[in-house]
């Protein structure tokens, strides 16, 4: 449902942010 879509989007955003942070280190 919508909640699952939001959860998936949140995970994608978290993954992108994490990768950006790791690249900076």
Curated annotation (Swiss-Prot):
One of its GO terms (biological process) is defense response to bacterium. It is found in: Secreted. Has hemolytic and antibacterial activity. One of its GO terms (cellular component) is extracellular region. This is Ocellatin-K1. Pfam families: Antimicrobial15 (PF08110). Keywords: Amidation, Amphibian defense peptide, Antibiotic, Antimicrobial, Cytolysis, Hemolysis, Secreted. The keyword Secreted applies. It comes from the Eukaryota. The keyword Transcription regulation does not apply. Transmembrane segments: none annotated. Belongs to the frog skin active peptide (FSAP) family. Ocellatin subfamily.
